[in-house]
Amino acid sequence: MLPVYAYLLHLLSGCVLIAVFFAIYTWITPFDEIALIREGNMAAALSLAGAVVGFCLTLASSILHSDGYEMFLLWSVGAMVVQSGGYAAITRMLPQMNGAIEHNNAAMGALMGTASLALGIINAACLS
């Protein structure tokens, strides 16, 4: 495959995978992040941003270190599972997290976003 085609394949696939992750992540949370963000809810924005960036770090590492396109897709699905599992674990450890985000507790949103970002960094490093 010509390098430009490989580039376009990974770029377009990455964009689609980000959209899929975004849809899944916002579906599993019990509140509507987009509506909250439109209302100016900083906690929801921080939480969602951390999850998306954490996922993107794993996508980038997968593109860099995978032997082929199929492995890139496999690791991407794995990253979705890890990020979603991280959300589930944090909200189980901190049951007030969801309510705090809905009520625009920016500190809790930052904590959730930072935890998601940290998980994404570790997950990305595991692929190298």
Task: State where each predicted segment sits.
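Interfacial loop-to-transmembrane junctions
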Residues: 96-116
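Loop-to-helix transition at the N-terminal end of transmembrane alpha-helices
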Residues: 36-49
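Hydrophobic alpha-helical transmembrane segments
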Residues: 8-12, 72-77, 110-111
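Alpha-helical transmembrane segments and their lipid-water interface positions
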Residues: 17, 21-22, 86-91, 128
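Transmembrane alpha-helical segments of integral membrane proteins
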Residues: 83-99
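Hydrophobic alpha-helical transmembrane segments in multi-pass integral membrane proteins
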Residues: 51-63, 113-128
